């Protein structure tokens, strides 16, 4: 049997590989394209994004562990709270290919709205099971709201730059 800390570490790390794979769209031509876009003055500096996402992914991952543990693993009761979590995580991972890969800022904005809605539903479901787990999602919800505003503003400010390109660079 695995030591008791293994599930906590495993769940905490689950969101990170998808986030890491998403960074592949931000390299090379994707980065050059992004650098050429008009950005609002409140656009965050590039260096802060990795620490922010690392923290948010770790918090949501650990929150999912708390839910899993509280509900006795992958039980019938865990289907909705962990299913909502998995759904919002899949939507989260879809954003970089949409924005940077396909260069579809409008569809990326829709994806962020859906991600935010699913993440809010996840937080509400988690609150019924473990209020501390739900609290771990609150910074993520705030960041998603900020990211949606930024995505929308960039989409509107770069009207001529929103046509799609190939997904692979």
Curated annotation (Swiss-Prot):
It is found in: Mitochondrion membrane. It is a multi-pass membrane protein. The chain crosses the membrane at residues 6-26, 47-67, 80-100, 106-126, 135-155. Pfam families: TspO_MBR. Keywords: Lipid transport, Membrane, Mitochondrion, Receptor, Transmembrane, Transmembrane helix, Transport. One of its GO terms (molecular function) is cholesterol binding. Residues 1-5, 68-79, 127-134 are mitochondrial intermembrane. Residues 27-46, 101-105, 156-169 are cytoplasmic. It comes from the Eukaryota. Interacts with TSPOAP1. Interacts with MOST-1. May interact with STAR. Promotes the transport of cholesterol across mitochondrial membranes and may play a role in lipid metabolism, but its precise physiological role is controversial. It is apparently not required for steroid hormone biosynthesis. Can bind protoporphyrin IX and may play a role in the transport of porphyrins and heme. Was initially identified as peripheral-type benzodiazepine receptor; can also bind isoquinoline carboxamides. Belongs to the TspO/BZRP family. This is Translocator protein.
